[in-house]
Curated annotation (Swiss-Prot):
Residues 257-348 are annotated as: Head domain (RuvB-H). It is found in: Cytoplasm. This is Holliday junction branch migration complex subunit RuvB. GO terms for cellular component: cytoplasm; Holliday junction resolvase complex. Residues 184-254 are annotated as: Small ATPAse domain (RuvB-S). It comes from Frankia casuarinae (strain DSM 45818 / CECT 9043 / HFP020203 / CcI3). It catalyses: ATP + H2O = ADP + phosphate + H(+).
Length: 348
């Protein structure tokens, strides 16, 4: 993964394989998402007491917050197999039929990016979720015949980063829905402390807090930064990750105190220094930093918006006072009401 992707919440296949060794195995080990954990605990205990699979579960929220981990934990707690697939992998209804008819009783089926499932497959899923059967259509036109196939009772765990793209009929068939929120710094520090123990890394409390503060509220990013800081500590120091070591390491990787990377800061600096804080159009802003508009909109803007550094208006993008402050610049308003910038001086 390139340095520019160091604070991206997306994960490569190699990183997902590495994450497997850090994933919690039980709800008690899972850090953060307190309400969701409590609700899932009650639901799973009730299902075990009844001897039946729990309701279908829909988990929504940004990537890297633990949706896959929770699906794995559910199967572990229920002591049943887990089968994993994704919406893009199911291109035809037949693909889904093959998966559903192969499920064992009580099995947990994890369907990542469920909002991207093909419509014919989605419609087939309705009956499977409600009645544990699928209707296979043989032939075409008036002579087509529907053959019902039984499906073993199962629990579907759907995960989505874009719940607004789910159709109403699909969303309504989930008995339990939960939204995963970003983590606070204390929760991320606990995640880092646990991961450091599993990786054999000596991490001080101050070092954990420093990495947590730059992790954008996302455990996946926190663990990724921890690995880079560990490398620095082993090569340039005595192997102990302190606050100073974390700061020095992340300075090399261009991750600043808020978790902004090179692209984030380039966008923010262009908006503030070249366009006086805005408003400026997306295309113009993207050209000024040598990127495509889609890259700026999809990669840089979401965190800048969430961090309160940028706002979108009908006239274009604008920097907030917090953006000027973060860059060490002082917003100055001239008599015409236009915002200009000047560097802070030591005498101010």
């Amino acid at each position: 993964m390139s340095d520019d992707g160091l604070v991206s919440a997306a994960a490569s296949p190699e990183e997902r394989a590495f994450e497997a060794g850090l994933r919690p195995r039980t709800l008690a080990e899972f850090v953060g998402q307190r309400k969701v954990r409590e609700q899932l605990t009650i639901m799973l205990e009730g299902a075990r007491a009844r001897g039946r699979p729990p309701d279908h579960v829909l988990l929504s929220g940004p990537p890297g917050l633990g949706k896959t981990s929770l699906a794995m934990i559910m199967a572990q707690e229920l002591e049943v197999p887990l089968r994993m697939t994704s919406g893009p992998a199911i291109e035809r209804a037949g693909d889904l039929v093959a998966i559903l008819t192969a499920l064992s009783p009580g099995e947990v089926l994890f369907l990542d990016e469920i909002h991207r499932i093909a419509r014919p497959a989605e419609e087939l899923l309705y009956a499977a979720m409600e009645d544990f059967r699928v209707d296979v259509i043989l032939g075409k036109g008036p002579g087509a015949t529907a053959i019902p196939l039984d499906v073993s009772p199962f629990t579907l765990v759907g995960a989505t980063t874009r719940s607004g793209l789910l159709t109403g009929p699909l969303r309504d068939r989930f008995g339990f829905t939960a939204h995963l929120d970003f983590y606070d710094a204390d929760e991320l520090a606990r995640v880092l402390t646990r991961s450091a123990g599993l990786l054999g890394v000596t991490l001080t409390a101050e070092g954990a807090a420093e990495v947590a503060g730059r992790s954008r509220g996302t455990p996946r990013i926190a663990n990724r930064l921890l690995r880079r800081v560990r490398d620095y500590a082993e090569v340039r120091a005595d192997g102990v990750v302190t606050r100073e070591i974390a700061q020095a390491a992340l300075r090399i990787y261009d991750v600043d105190g808020l978790g902004l990377d090179r692209l984030d800061r380039a966008v923010l600096e262009a908006l503030v220094t070249r366009f006086g804080g805005g408003p400026v159009g997306l295309t113009t802003l993207a050209v000024s930093v040598g990127e495509e508009p889609e890259t700026v909109e999809d990669v840089a803007e979401p965190f800048l918006l969430r961090a309160g550094l940028l706002i979108r208006t009908a006239r274009g993008r604008m920097a907030t006072p917090a953006a000027f402050e973060h860059l060490g610049l002082d917003p100055v308003t001239d008599p015409l009401g236009r915002t200009q910038v000047s560097l802070f001086t030591e005498g101010e």
